[in-house]
A protein has these predicted regions:
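Serine-hydrolase catalytic machinery in alpha/beta-hydrolase-like enzymes
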Residues: 70-173, 273
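Short alpha-helix in the alpha/beta-hydrolase fold that links the catalytic acid
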Residues: 121, 239-249
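Alpha/beta-hydrolase fold nucleophile elbow
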Residues: 176-186
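Gly/Ala-rich beta-loop-alpha elbow adjacent to hydrolase catalytic centers
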Residues: 185-189, 193
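A conserved short beta-strand
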Residues: 202-212
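Short beta-strand/loop motif that positions the catalytic acidic residue
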Residues: 223, 229-231
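Acidic catalytic loop of the alpha/beta-hydrolase fold
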Residues: 234-238
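C-terminal catalytic histidine-bearing segment of alpha/beta-hydrolase fold enzymes
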Residues: 251-298
Length: 298
């Protein structure tokens, strides 16, 4: 079995966090508390990620591709603007340019922050007849390297994050008098989408892409609306077994849900910035997402 130096030693030797090599049968994660890398058994990784003690490591971000290019636009022309909705945070709002009573969606970014790709996804969803507020959980900071993302997510305060997202919900209800509202997020944002559902009773639909799941029935019991979960078979952090347990808890609580596990793909398969990107599965997942929102918010 090949031996590799401890992760911290590799970083001191100048290795990028996303390029750290773990010994066989171990997986690389970052400790949520201090951002330090660690090589752990996959069984431990899934537990730590579920409990919020660890996060995935992704390759550096690239703008060579973006998801919005592979999805057809909806029937509406859109308009966009920056809005102040919480403390120092400015969100990106996209909405149909025509008058009408549209449902709303809170969109939550990946661990990179509110970047151009998330803004483009907000525009794409808005074109299907939604008022979309893409929140900023990092106070106007965006990461493009794994090291920058590590620093941002390590500094993230989950309690403040809940306040931030709840403020986004309140903003949409106050400013646009929306009658129905949902949430969606990817990766870090997928876990936050579920976290918002657990900590807000004013939603009507929740979508999460390969985000941190929960098996805590007491927390999940707050959800009284449909949930769509998109996951990856090869994800060693959000494992198939943990997703199945999550689905079981939802069913036991009588929460309407659709859990989809795409075979042969890995965590962040809908992220165009890395080699895990799977365009066909991403497109299928997005079509299911739009249909889910159409069925539950309109």
């Amino acid at each position: 079995m090949a031996y590799f130096p401890p992760p911290l030693k590799q970083i001191k030797d100048g290795v990028n966090p996303s390029n750290i090599t773990c010994s066989e049968r171990l997986e690389l994660v970052l400790k949520q508390s201090n951002g330090e890398p660690a090589c752990l058994k996959p069984s431990s990784v899934s537990i730590l990620i579920e409990r919020g003690w660890a996060i995935h490591v992704l390759p550096d971000y690239t703008t060579e591709n973006n998801n919005s290019e592979i999805f057809p636009s909806g029937q509406y022309e859109i308009e966009t603007k920056r809005v102040s909705y919480f403390d120092e945070s400015q969100g990106f709002l996209a909405k149909p340019s025509t008058a009408g009573n549209f449902p709303a969606v809170v969109m939550i970014h990946e661990l990179w922050g509110l970047n151009e790709n998330i803004e483009e996804m907000a525009e794409k969803l808005a074109s299907h007849g939604y008022i979309v507020l893409a929140v900023d959980l990092y106070k106007n900071q965006v990461g493009t390297t794994s090291e920058e993302a590590r620093q941002l997510v390590t500094a993230f305060d989950s309690k403040v994050g809940v306040e931030n997202m709840n403020s986004a919900v309140s903003y949409l209800k106050t400013e646009y008098s929306v009658e129905s509202i949902g949430s969606i997020g990817w990766c870090f944002g997928g876990g936050q989408s579920l976290n918002l559902a657990i900590n807000n009773s004013d939603l009507d639909a929740t979508v999460m892409y390969y985000g941190q799941v929960s098996s805590d029935s007491e927390k999940l019991s707050n959800i009284s609306w449909p949930l769509l979960g998109i996951f990856a078979e090869k994800d060693q952090g959000i494992t198939v077994s943990s997703v199945k347990q999550f689905e079981l808890q939802l069913n036991d609580l009588g929460i309407t849900n659709e859990i989809i596990i795409y075979p042969g793909v890995d965590h962040a398969f809908a992220n165009p910035s890395g080699d895990r990107y799977a365009p066909e599965e991403s497109q299928d997942a997005w079509q299911k997402t739009v249909s889910f929102f159409n069925n539950n918010l309109k």
